[in-house]
Amino acid sequence: FVATSKEAKEAMELAEMVYEGDISLQTVSFCRMEAQQECLAGSFCIPKLLDVQGSRYRILFFINQRHIVIIDDNDFSWRLIMRIRQNRTKQGETREHFIYNFIGQFMSRDVETLGRYESLIMDMEEKVMDGVIEGFQNEIMPIRKELLTLRGYYDQLMDMGKELEENENGFFAKKRLKYFGIIA
């Protein structure tokens, strides 16, 4: 199920999802997982790669024995799912595989982005080696801030992967926990 905040209550009921808490995308400020008695609840706070320090995609998701509910007020999750459908012959016939593909889709452009940072830093290093140091600090500081932001985000995703792999609620098949190990 993919729903907006307004549709969340209905989607949760249809999926027989019991969540003890408020469902609010406005409170999403980082990536995390929480095991509850009846479901796993998680959030994604994904930096927009063209503006790492700016606004983010905010998504809530809930997993129980049979279903996944994704709450997203933008069309970001729908676009990810459409890309999964276009690019994957095995789109996610299990919840574990779907979660792996979903996270993989929003991380798919990260390597390219990190490569751009690497090129920028290498160009700056060459200038410094050539004795051109004017403006170096002003150029490097925003890059450093963006890389620190991305590092925090990736640390959160790794923690989330570990929590999924721990399978505290026993919602996932042991043989499929390997998908979460790849994320971690």
Predicted regions and their residues:
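Peripheral, non-transmembrane regulatory/ligand-interaction domains of membrane transport proteins
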Residues: 1-182
